[in-house]
Amino acid sequence: MRSIRKRWTICTISLLLIFYKTKEMARTEEHQETQLIGDGELSLSRSLVNSSDKIIRKAGSSIFQHSVEGGKINSSLVLEIRKNILRFLDAERDVSVVKSSFKPGDVIHYVLDRRRTLNISQDLHSLLPEVSPMKNRRFKTCAVVGNSGILLDSECGKEIDSHNFVIRCNLAPVVEFAADVGTKSDFITMNPSVVQRAFGGFRNESDREKFVHRLSMLNDSVLWIPAFMVKGGEKHVEWVNALILKNKLKVRTAYPSLRLIHAVRGYWLTNKVPIKRPSTGLLMYTLATRFCDEIHLYGFWPFPKDLNGKAVKYHYYDDLKYRYFSNASPHRMPLEFKTLNVLHNRGALKLTTGKCIKQ
């Protein structure tokens, strides 16, 4: 009996030691996850997820103070980043599947929900590009325009439009906000959810006409539709495809490759930036490194207030609310922003979060 109690005591002590050792290892891994490697190393403190107000109060003397005007672009760093990203993906190829990738009737699994499948329709197949829309494209300067309300009253429109190539997100309206956001659109993303949110789900002819008019303004720009991410938006994608074909719109459609989002996430995780799913803005920056010598970011500000404590809308064009620090969010936008700000300070990109300087 005494020997049995002794064995139980030893087992209990061993289990406790394993438990505490595992806990300590997890704590160490968590700490290591929060380091951005390279020069200008950034410690991603817990305050990032605890309170936006704390971050903004720190901003005056820390991470945001250089975000309005940047210095010169560090060309060697830009090339280094491009080379490293090419180890994970080639934006020229992965920006879109092409017609030869599938045939009508093929069944594919959704990227973020492998249990669900999608049939490649005739309309979808007919709109797939023959070759990548970014094949052999190269630009001196590019603008990636996010949709934060920080753009309002920024007077950045002319500066944005002056870039050789302008990337916009989620089919955001531009004409009525031209002074702040510009109107040039060379590449524009459109999540399927935009159909419901901005165009009433095409419930009536007026909604459809509004959508067709918006696309007609794009001319031969690239319309990038993430059609293979998750189930739920397939009917919206089909409606969009049908309207493009019916109205013979000149827009050039593109549909991201099935590996793109995992490849982008893999690059950032390898560089110790523990994102969940990359936001559209981070995705577009990552792609742009392939074909842009200089990348300028506008409309990136994932906080409810600016540096002066003034309220900032989630989108410059609507009243949609967003909980930036919610664990339920698929994105970690404040973390992404802080990472991009480090790259700004190192000269890898230019991040504008205030008024643009008139030329």
From Swiss-Prot:
GO terms for molecular function: alpha-N-acetylneuraminate alpha-2,8-sialyltransferase activity; sialyltransferase activity. The active site is at H331 (proton donor/acceptor). GO terms for biological process: N-glycan processing; oligosaccharide metabolic process; protein glycosylation; sialylation. Keywords: Disulfide bond, Glycoprotein, Glycosyltransferase, Golgi apparatus, Membrane, Secreted, Signal-anchor, Transferase, Transmembrane, Transmembrane helix. Disulfide bonds join C142-C292, C156-C356. Residues 21-359 are lumenal. Residues 1-7 are cytoplasmic. It is found in: Golgi apparatus membrane; Secreted. PANTHER family: ALPHA-2,8-SIALYLTRANSFERASE, CMP-N-ACETYLNEURAMINATE-POLY-ALPHA-2,8-SIALYLTRANSFERASE. This is CMP-N-acetylneuraminate-poly-alpha-2,8-sialyltransferase. The lineage of its organism: Eukaryota, Metazoa, Chordata, Craniata, Vertebrata. The gene is ST8SIA4.
